[in-house]
Amino acid sequence: MKVAIFGGTFNPIHIGHLIMAQYVKNFSEVDRVIFVPNGVPPHKNVDIALPEDRFEMVKLSIEDNPDFEISDFEIKNKEPSWTINTLNYFATSYEKVYFILGSDNLFEIIKWYRAEEILKKFPIIVLPRERNTTLIRRQIEELGIQFSAKMVLIDMPIIDISSTEIRRLIRENKSIRYMVHPKVEEYIIRKGLYKE
């Protein structure tokens, strides 16, 4: 089975994440998209909900889609969530492992822990975060030349929703309806998440 690993803080998961994952399933050769919420994100120290809450929100968002699944690999691991460790873990169980990367991280990936190994070993599905893809395509080409990286850019609409904006709306007691799965909205309200 060919799988695409969709890692992230998912703080909280929103419809943009779900649409991106569905585009990956629709327009690549992967059989399944595996959501992997970060346990201890190495590069972020913002207002992050408990790993268990973020895991539950992802689970609620994807439970009715047979093409999606969730893994607690990073959440169970108490070490920082390094991408290479996660990809290597899944590579032991699946025929082919792809890595989903937002184009905003395309220019940062070479600074990541064991970046060269990621780029040489795993094919990468790039999702655009901006309308003009000229620089993105150029960077994909350069990484291909420098590291023999296998990358493909999925042509899809820009989904301009962010978890940061959702958390701000919650703090201001504004509605997040249509921005997250209804079950996630219900969960956030019930648990009182992101109020402070």
Swiss-Prot record:
Q: What is its EC number?
A: 2.7.7.18
Record-level GO BP terms: NAD biosynthetic process
Catalytic activity reads: nicotinate beta-D-ribonucleotide + ATP + H(+) = deamido-NAD(+) + diphosphate
Hey, which pathway is this one from? Cofactor biosynthesis; NAD(+) biosynthesis; deamido-NAD(+) from nicotinate D-ribonucleotide: step 1/1
- The top EC class, named as a word, is transferase
- Keywords, sorted A to Z: ATP-binding, NAD, Nucleotide-binding, Nucleotidyltransferase, Pyridine nucleotide biosynthesis, Transferase
Cite a single GO MF annotation: ATP binding
Stated role: Catalyzes the reversible adenylation of nicotinate mononucleotide (NaMN) to nicotinic acid adenine dinucleotide (NaAD).
Entry's family note: Belongs to the NadD family.
**NCBIfam families, per the entry:** cyt_tran_rel, nicotinate (nicotinamide) nucleotide adenylyltransferase, PRK00071.1-3
The name under which this protein is listed is Probable nicotinate-nucleotide adenylyltransferase
Q: Which organism is it from?
A: Caldicellulosiruptor saccharolyticus (strain ATCC 43494 / DSM 8903 / Tp8T 6331)
